A protein has these predicted regions:
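HDAC/HDAC-like amidohydrolase catalytic core signature
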Residues: 1-156, 161-280
Length: 280
């Protein structure tokens, strides 16, 4: 089984203010950890605007470009910042998502991992927020559907915060099954079980603070995995956030490292039976 690793040094050009929780060092440490692994290392291309326009209007792209500072930082809100290299980093991240889908669907690799930043699952169609500028996971799903002609794609989003942006971008897309687990109550306040999408293809699994990995595993076994099997996706996209870890200070789901391993391996195993192992 071949796994592609898509990343680019430009993703390190998105610089946040001192003390910000989403910082360059996060990606640097991931890349160091991946160095000894046998992966097909692939440079993430810059996303082209025709691809980005599948999920964002031109006005969103223009407003990001207009807000770029010549030096220092530009605050878009209390959490979300731009530095001079932020847009280039974001376009590399989005390009990685598109390229990963291309590689997996073509059969060049079995699956792919995008080590990118800034993150994306809070970015709505016209609003950057929560550290996020572009909706990478939603873009990957739309690219698989509209460019490659797939009929059904699943997106699984695990994070301590709900992926409100991915949900907004895919809420009326009946060809995508979106499954999301998140701590509730917690910012951004969305992700309740009553948010099911226009075509009943959104599954939210809110988890209580401190509930830990046992509650997560029960939720996925009882709700997520049966829905995936019923939906029969041709590709599974994992939108992975690791702030549910017990060592992360921002919230309190208290997952262990093994919980993340278990969930990823279970999703890959399901993909083996459902969609030829195709996972991004």
């Amino acid at each position: 089984m071949t796994t592609a690793l898509l990343t680019h040094p430009d993703c390190l050009k998105h610089v946040t203010p001192p003390g910000h929780p989403e910082q360059v060092a996060r990606l640097e440490r991931v890349l160091v950890a991946l160095e000894p692994m046998d992966l097909l290392r692939t440079a993430a291309p810059l996303a082209v605007e025709d691809d980005l326009l599948r999920i964002h209007p031109q006005s969103h792209l223009d407003s990001l470009r207009a807000a770029l500072p010549a030096a220092g930082y530009a605050g878009l809100d209390g959490d979300t910042f731009l530095s001079p290299g932020s847009l280039e980093a974001a376009y590399r991240g989005a390009g990685a998502a598109v390229k990963a889908v291309d590689m997996v669907i073509s059969g060049a690799v079995q699956n792919a991992f995008c080590a990118i930043r800034p993150p994306g699952h809070h970015a709505e169609s016209e609003t950057p927020m929560g550290f996020c500028l572009l909706g990478n996971a939603a873009l990957a799903a739309k690219h698989a559907l509209d460019h490659h002609g797939l009929d059904r794609v699943a997106v699984v989003d695990f994070d301590v915060h709900h992926g409100n942006g991915t949900q907004e971008l895919l809420y009326d897309e009946g060809r995508v099954l979106l499954i999301a687990s998140q701590q509730m109550p917690l910012w951004p306040g969305s992700g309740g079980i009553d948010e099911t999408g226009v075509f009943d293809t959104v599954v939210n699994m809110p988890l209580a603070p401190g509930s830990g990995g046992v509650a997560m595993r029960r939720a996925y076994e009882a709700q997520a995995f049966p829905r995936l099997e019923a939906f029969q996706p041709e590709l599974i996209i994992i939108s992975a956030g690791f702030d549910a870890h017990h060592a992360d200070p921002l919230a309190g789901l208290n997952w262990s490292t093994d919980d993340f391993r278990w969930l990823t391996m279970r999703l890959c195993a399901l993909a083996g039976g459902l969609c030829k192992g195709r996972v991004v």
